[in-house]
Amino acid sequence: MRYKNIAVLMTALDSESQAVELKGIEEFGKSRGYNIAVFVWYTGAFEKEKHNTGEVNIVNLPDLSLFDGVIVFSNVFHIEKNRQLIEDALDKLTCPIVCIGCRLKDYYSIHTDNYTAMRKLVEHFVVDHKVKDIHFVKGIEGNEDAAERYRAFEDVMREHNLPILPERISQGDFYV
């Protein structure tokens, strides 16, 4: 019997949530007789471009076409150039691909509905607590999840005729 081989692409192995998710993947794989190969690199939102490019190129080291499936953690996509490099590598594959934490092309995905979650949170402050002066901290520019959260904030504020003042909007440096 041939074992199934699953590749996991991720960064931030030091992230508690990803360590827990990876442990779950490994335990499930072991219980089913799958081989799990984890490819980890470090790319940070504040690193030098050459560093990020070099690190993300680790995805090109294994021959991903030899795997029966690929799992991709979304934190690899917080830099657009990295996203494109990963997409290029994945586009060549015929095996199932699952993205955790993001939507990517037509691949299977497990992700959070950031818009609905933020909308409910802002509505809770505005309706239940009668808060009118809200300071919003945005995520990294160009991050789809951050944009969805900010759009939800704007929508609720407008629906309740509350001001969205530039001095109450801060640019954050996080991507999750």
Task: Show which residues each predicted segment covers.
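Bacterial carbohydrate/catabolite-sensing allosteric modules
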Residues: 1-48, 54-176
